[in-house]
């Protein structure tokens, strides 16, 4: 059986989600997405010309990808809901990544407003993937509100600082019966692989790919890292030990 990630009505074989911001051009973005094999692509609605969407970056996203508009720029649940409704009305589908940010220095998500927006949009039939500051109680409330998956940050968005919240993410993976998709802060393929080895369902990467010297090659590197991390998780990582343990007998062969 294929190792598929089921979210909403989609069965995904790629566990790398890609953001479309910060690329030098739409053409490079499209090439990077294509080389990565990603099936879910997130885009900020405020960058899309809704009067002529086919002349925006949407034109360069490979056919067959699931488009996941995000509510970047929303400061309240009400603003996030409004953006999501506009996206669906414009033909962008019913997937939405909820981003509600009131902190303008670290761009940390407002978990309280995120729960409110999730509950409203889930009731309206959206497939809601909320971006959140990792917190077990909030994650439980997001699940109760109807989230299809939960997207905790690894580090502040765009920072490329890696999995600074790894222990909190590990708790969510253990305790929440929903796909946990690590979003924000991942700066290296090795960090994406670590998230997958921990048991994350997927990772979302943007800045680390878009701002690399060769974004297309970096997208491929992340794809391979995510695949390797998932394979390692399914294979079962060997336990760590405090002391050394020889792989071959140390006594008896000289007798």
UniProtKB/Swiss-Prot annotation:
Where is the protein situated, by its record's location annotation? Cytoplasm
Q: Which organism is it from?
A: Moorella thermoacetica (strain ATCC 39073 / JCM 9320)
Q: Which reaction does it catalyse?
A: [ThiS sulfur-carrier protein]-C-terminal-Gly-aminoethanethioate + 2-iminoacetate + 1-deoxy-D-xylulose 5-phosphate = [ThiS sulfur-carrier protein]-C-terminal Gly-Gly + 2-[(2R,5Z)-2-carboxy-4-methylthiazol-5(2H)-ylidene]ethyl phosphate + 2 H2O + H(+)
* Entry keyword annotation includes Cell membrane: no
InterPro entries under this entry? Answer: Aldolase_TIM (IPR013785), Thiazole_synthase_ThiG (IPR033983), ThiG (IPR008867)
- Enzyme Commission no: 2.8.1.10
Gene Ontology biological-process entries: thiamine diphosphate biosynthetic process
Provide the active-site residues from the annotation. Answer: 97
Q: In which pathway does it act?
A: Cofactor biosynthesis; thiamine diphosphate biosynthesis
What is the name of this protein?
Thiazole synthase
The GO terms this record gives for MF are: thiazole synthase activity
The superkingdom listed in its UniProt entry is: Bacteria
- Give any Pfam family that matches: ThiG
Function noted in UniProt: Catalyzes the rearrangement of 1-deoxy-D-xylulose 5-phosphate (DXP) to produce the thiazole phosphate moiety of thiamine. Sulfur is provided by the thiocarboxylate moiety of the carrier protein ThiS. In vitro, sulfur can be provided by H(2)S.
What is the similarity comment for this entry? Belongs to the ThiG family.
User: How does this chain assemble?
Assistant: Homotetramer. Forms heterodimers with either ThiH or ThiS.
Family annotation (CDD domains)? ThiG
Q: Write out the GO cellular component annotations.
A: cytoplasm
* Primary site of residence: cytoplasm
């Amino acid at each position: 059986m294929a190792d598929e990630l089921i979210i909403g009505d989609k069965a995904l074989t790629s566990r790398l989600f890609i953001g479309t911001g910060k690329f030098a051009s739409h053409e490079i973005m499209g090439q990077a997405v294509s080389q990565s094999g990603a099936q879910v692509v997130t885009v900020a609605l405020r960058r899309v010309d809704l009067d002529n969407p086919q002349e925006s970056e949407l034109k360069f996203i490979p056919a067959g990808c699931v488009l996941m508009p995000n509510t970047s720029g929303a400061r309240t649940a009400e603003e996030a809901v409004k953006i999501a409704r506009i996206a669906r009305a414009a033909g962008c589908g019913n997937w939405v990544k909820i981003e509600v940010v009131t902190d303008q220095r670290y761009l940390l998500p407002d978990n309280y407003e995120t729960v409110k927006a999730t509950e409203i949009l889930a009731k309206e039939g959206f497939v809601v993937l909320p971006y959140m500051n990792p917190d077990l109680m909030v994650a439980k409330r997001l699940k109760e509100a109807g989230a299809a998956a939960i997207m905790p940050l690894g580090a502040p968005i765009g920072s490329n600082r890696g999995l600074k919240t790894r222990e909190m993410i590990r708790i969510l993976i253990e305790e929440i019966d929903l796909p946990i998709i690590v979003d924000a802060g991942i700066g290296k393929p090795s960090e994406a692989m670590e998230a997958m080895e921990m048991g994350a369902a997927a990772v979302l990467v943007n800045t680390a790919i878009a701002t690399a010297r060769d974004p297309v090659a970096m997208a491929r590197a992340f794809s391979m890292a995510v695949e390797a991390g998932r394979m390692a998780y399914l294979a079962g990582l060997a336990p760590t030990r405090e002391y050394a343990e020889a792989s071959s007998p140390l006594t008896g062969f000289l007798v």
